[in-house]
Structures are given as structure tokens and as C-alpha cells.
Curated annotation (Swiss-Prot):
InterPro entries assigned to the protein according to its UniProt record, in alphabetical order: AdipoR/HlyIII-related
Pfam families: HlyIII (PF03006)
Species, as recorded: Cynoscion nebulosus (Spotted seatrout)
Reported function: Steroid membrane receptor. Binds progesterone, progestin and 17-hydroxyprogesterone in vitro. Capable of mediating progestin-induced oocyte maturation.
Name of the molecule in the record: Membrane progestin receptor alpha
Induction trigger: By progestin in ovarian tissues and human chorionic gonadotropin (hCG) in oocytes undergoing meiotic maturation.
Family membership noted in the UniProt record: Belongs to the ADIPOR family.
Disulfide feature: none
Superkingdom of the organism of origin: Eukaryota
GO MF entries: nuclear steroid receptor activity; steroid binding
Length: 352
């Protein structure tokens, strides 16, 4: 009996020894990351207005930047807001796919496109904020990828709004013009953002912002027009459609987010106080995420409840619209790649 007890105690001792090794194993698996640095310690390309600390050191290993997902720095919230939102979109995608045949139902393809587009822009944005600090070329590469995601989401939203949310009166006015114009403006947004970022050393900060904001604003005005017309028509008729409320809120959330994207508040009022939490761009991320999730819920409901209406209205439009989506995505990706090559050549010349 005593021997058995001693064996059990010995096993407990060995287990205790193994438990003591866990912190060492974790430390070897997740090494201590270099501390963040001040704005004066990083090249100008990484600097953000009114953000004075929390920058990650450039020229580290890729592993370091992936591990900074779990480090406190001035991009942490920007990464996690869109990363978690991308996961939520995947969950919604799986949930919807249990009742919707995306492959065989052509009228479900625009819903598939907007879900794919939302996941794409959220994922690309998270990658840009996580990995862009490695080098100047990485900075441009990942933000150009982010802009491709923005273009894809713009067209995906335009298609879904046009297909599911539009009223017959507005459809009559924009039929045949809406989707090609939406595709062009989505590409123009990608080009404007990429060129503005590429030319930013020679442009004032405001001009760089204009290259991003003006094409995006034009695209949004067109893309959201079916929704705005529907909200207005509902208000005029005094209807009580709950889906219209969802559409109204996702417009409001987007406009609030756009304000924080354009205006560096509150960090401009409290320089250095919002370096880790409270930046305008973080607030922009939060509102855009809420906007996207509200939009998806509204379109999902429209897909179910308005099917007889949009089947008669659009006929076999879905296949052509999907082809235009692929074309827009390819053009945007090629544009981003071309501007990246220009950046690479410019950095090579500067290095010489």
C-alpha cells in the first residue's frame, strides 16, 4: 500500500515538474516581442497624424508581425475589429447556406457575392493593418490589397442593393446603366486610393485623402441610391416594413463611419492620448462593421421576402452581374499590381 502511495506521489511530482515547464514552453513558442516605439523612430511612411506612440519596429521577421496580433500597439484594435467581423460573416455565410442553394439558384448569386465581398474587404483590411509595418514595400503592397477589397465590396454592395432592395420606379430610371457605372466607380476607387498612396510623398496629406474620398463618395452615392429611394418611398407611403429600418440604420452607420475616416477625431484634439484606443480610424472600423452586418441582415431578409418581385424584375441578369463582378475584381487587382511595381521601382531607385 505504501509503495502504491509513493508511486502516486512520484507521478504527482513529475506532473508538477511538467507544469512548471509550461511557462518556459509558452515563452519559447511566443517569444517576448520587441517593445513598440515612438513616431520619431519609424520612417515617415508609417506615421499617422496625432498618433505619437505604439508603432511596431520595421524590418522584423514575418513571424514577429503575425505575433503582434496579440500585442498592444496602435493597430491592434484596427486588426481585431475587422478580423472578428470577417469571422462573423463566415458564420452567417454558413448559416445562410443551410437554406440557400448558392450554386444552383441564380437569384441567390448576388447574395453570395455580397457575402464574399464583405469577407474579402474585412480580411484584406485586417492583413493590411497587421502586416504593413514590415517595410515600405510591404506597407504599399498590403494597403493596395486593402483597396482591392474595398473595390470588390463596393461592387458587391451595389449589385445586392440593385438586385434585392430596389423599387420598380428607380429600376426603370437606372436599368442598363447602374451596374456598369458601379463597376467603373469601384475600379476608380481602387485606382484613386492606390495612386494617392503612391504619390503621397509629393502630395499634401489632404490631397492624398481626396484621392481616396472623392471616388469612394461618388461610388457610394450610386451604390446606395436604390436603398435611399426605397427608404424615401416607404416614408412617403407611411409603410411599416421592418427591413427598411435595417436599411436606414446601415446608411446611418456608414455615414458616421465616413465622418471618422475623413476627420482625425478625437486624436487631433488629444494628440498622444488615443494612440492605443479611441482613434478615429478605430471608430471608423467599428461603425463600418456594424454597417456591414446590418446591411447583410437587411439583404438576407429582402432575398427571402421579395423573391417574386425581383425574379420578375431581373430575369436572368444574375449571370451577367457575376461576370461583371469578376471583371471588376480582376481589373482592380491588376491596377494594384501595376502601381505596386511602380512603387517597387521607385524604392529601388531611392535605395541606389
Amino acid at each position: 500500500m505504501a509503495t502504491v502511495v509513493m508511486e502516486q506521489i512520484g507521478r504527482l511530482f513529475i506532473n508538477a515538474q511538467q507544469l512548471r515547464q509550461i511557462p518556459q514552453l509558452l515563452e519559447s513558442a511566443f517569444p517576448t516581442l520587441p517593445c513598440t516605439v515612438k513616431v520619431s523612430d519609424v520612417p515617415w511612411v508609417f506615421r499617422e497624424r496625432h498618433i505619437l506612440t505604439g508603432y511596431r519596429q520595421p524590418d522584423q521577421s514575418w513571424r514577429y508581425y503575425f505575433l503582434t496580433l496579440f500585442q498592444r500597439h496602435n493597430e491592434t484594435l484596427n486588426v481585431w475589429t475587422h478580423l472578428l467581423a470577417a469571422f462573423i460573416i463566415l458564420v452567417k455565410w454558413q448559416e445562410i447556406s443551410e437554406t440557400v442553394d448558392f450554386l444552383r439558384d441564380p437569384h441567390a448569386q448576388p447574395l453570395f457575392i455580397v457575402l464574399l465581398a464583405a469577407f474579402t474587404y474585412l480580411s484584406f483590411s485586417a492583413l493590411a493593418h497587421l502586416l504593413s509595418a514590415k517595410s515600405e514595400l510591404s506597407y504599399y503592397t498590403f494597403y493596395f490589397l486593402d483597396y482591392v477589397g474595398v473595390a470588390v465590396y463596393q461592387y458587391g454592395s451595389a449589385l445586392a442593393h440593385y438586385y434585392y432592395a430596389i423599387e420598380k420606379e428607380w429600376h426603370t430610371k437606372v436599368q442598363g446603366l447602374f451596374l456598369p457605372a458601379a463597376a467603373f466607380l469601384a475600379w476608380l476607387t481602387c485606382f484613386g486610393c492606390c495612386y494617392g498612396k503612391y504619390a503621397s510623398p509629393e502630395l499634401p496629406k489632404v490631397a492624398n485623402k481626396l484621392f481616396q474620398v472623392v471616388p469612394s463618395a461618388l461610388a457610394y452615392c450610386l451604390d446606395i441610391s436604390p436603398v435611399v429611394h426605397r427608404i424615401y418611398s416607404c416614408y412617403q407611403e407611411g409603410c411599416s416594413d421592418p427591413v427598411v429600418a435595417y436599411h436606414f440604420y446601415h446608411v446611418v452607420f456608414f455615414l458616421i463611419g465616413a465622418y471618422f475616416f475623413c476627420c482625425p477625431h478625437p486624436e487631433s484634439l488629444f494628440p498622444g492620448k488615443c494612440d492605443f484606443i479611441g482613434q478615429g480610424h478605430q471608430l471608423f472600423h467599428v461603425f463600418v462593421v456594424v454597417c456591414t452586418l446590418t446591411q447583410v441582415e437587411a439583404l438576407r431578409t429582402d432575398f427571402t421576402e421579395r423573391r417574386p418581385f425581383y425574379e420578375r424584375l431581373h430575369g436572368d441578369l444574375a449571370h451577367d452581374a457575376v461576370a461583371l463582378f469578376i471583371f471588376t475584381a480582376c481589373c482592380s487587382a491588376l491596377t494594384a499590381f501595376y502601381v505596386r511595381q511602380r512603387v517597387r521601382a521607385s524604392l529601388h531607385e531611392k535605395g541606389e
